[in-house]
Amino acid sequence: RDKKENIYDDNYTIISQYYPVERNNNASFKDLHLLQEAYYNTGKGDRFGLNAWYINSNRELGRLTSDQSDGTRFENRQREHTLRSVLSWDHTRENWKLGTKAGYIYTWMAYDYKNDKGNGDMASMTRSRSKINTLYGQVDGEYFLTEKLLFTAGLSAHQHFVKSSDKNIITLVGNRAVVGYDKARVELSGTVSAKWRPIERLGMSVVLREEMYGDNWSPIIPAFFVDYVLSKKGNITAKASITRNYRFPTLNDLYFLPGGNTDLKRESGFTYEAGLSFAVGKDNVYTLSGSASWFDQHVNDWIIWLPNFKGYYSPLNIKEVHAYGIETEADLALRLAKNWKLGVHSTFAWTPSINEGEPMSSADQSLGKQLPYVPEYSATLSGRLSYRSWSLLYKWCYYSERYTMTSNKKTLTGHLPHYLMSNVTLEKGFSLRWADLSLKGTVNNLFNEEYLSVLSRPMPGINFEFFIGITPK
């Protein structure tokens, strides 16, 4: 509803206005996803694994609702090729366990924007290319000193090589031409923890973590967790935790063109959480579980991407953010008859995220306001009805009003209305001699809801998908 049309009388006086209904024909996509997993168990406590994922994506990016141009006169396309591969080894003994992983990730991503020069000849305005190579390794270990005391330790390392450029733009640094950015960074993370259960009802754990990003080290990051069974009947358990948090800017945060900000500071803060959980049930009849928790988080130098006066998004630090709220969750599994099963899962969250920092200028109206694009309320509900190899799945979600500006002004472009979303899926499974086969049909946006997740980018109305899943035996 960004394009308003005027209706004039014979004297060219506006007598009425309306928003025309338009169709966005620039949002097609083709995706190919392949996953292969292979495991070998020696039967002597060792398991070896190989996992590989491949993604080939080619999609158009739909026009903004504020774009009044002819959709046939431009091309706005993003392509991606990604390969993720992991080798793993798990070694298990009576009172200790060791696991290792090594992997490689390659991503090639292209963004092209072309515009018709007027004679049908498409001119490239943007030719963005990114290549990301990541090597990583991980080692985790567990050791039971006694039945009541468990020690764990872990170490992970990532080496990123990122080259990103726009072939239509060349910048100069000194006397050297630089196209985009070409950066490498090592990231290390190490953790040690001790988990102690002195009595059957009480459990406590302490975690110490330290991280390195490039040349920057975090201080030692502690966390403490405790849980206590208030009642064995219903398995009612109280839980609480306090955690120190750090987050370093990503390479995109620092160097993305256009918009990267090399002056970003790392986030830091504390999170406090407390809650209750329960679980009841009857064998082969039903199980019911649920939890409710309160959290309070104070973050200094929160990193957020916001539009700037130059017309594109750029990350910046918010001096202090106070995020708090309540989160609830419930699960029900019910056997209705011999071959009939019903599963229900629901969540609800109230999560204010308030800017409590310092004004950036005399005109700054963001203090005391909700952060942009963060809903204060959200909820989900899903239900699965199964009969033998058939299943019917219904998903529902709700997101409250979100603001697009730090001032939280409720103008036409200053907020996104709340919306409800429903999806339904029917699935049939087949067991063949050589593979398990699944056929699945999905109706997304069942009630054809009009909604936005990002300003000026309308989401699809009712749409349909069909999936074929093959799992070799």
Residue ranges and their predicted role:
Residues 2-4, 300, 344, 398-407, ...:
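C-terminal beta-signal and adjacent terminal beta-strands/loops
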Residues 77-86, 91-92, 104, 112-205, ...:
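Outer-membrane beta-barrel transmembrane domain signature of Gram-negative proteins
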Residues 41-45, 92-96, 144-148, 197-203, ...:
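Outer-membrane beta-barrel channels and translocator barrels
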Residues 95-113, 231, 237-239, 266-324, ...:
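Membrane-embedded beta-barrel scaffold of Gram-negative outer-membrane proteins
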Residues 197-201, 293-298, 317-406:
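Gram-negative outer-membrane beta-barrel transporters
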Residues 1, 54-58, 93, 104-110, ...:
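Transmembrane beta-strands of outer-membrane beta-barrel pores
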Residues 146-152, 156-162, 172-297:
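Structural signature of Gram-negative outer-membrane beta-barrels, strongest in the C-terminal barrel
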Residues 2-10, 21-33, 39-98, 106-132:
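Flexible loop and strand-edge segments within Gram-negative outer membrane beta-barrel domains
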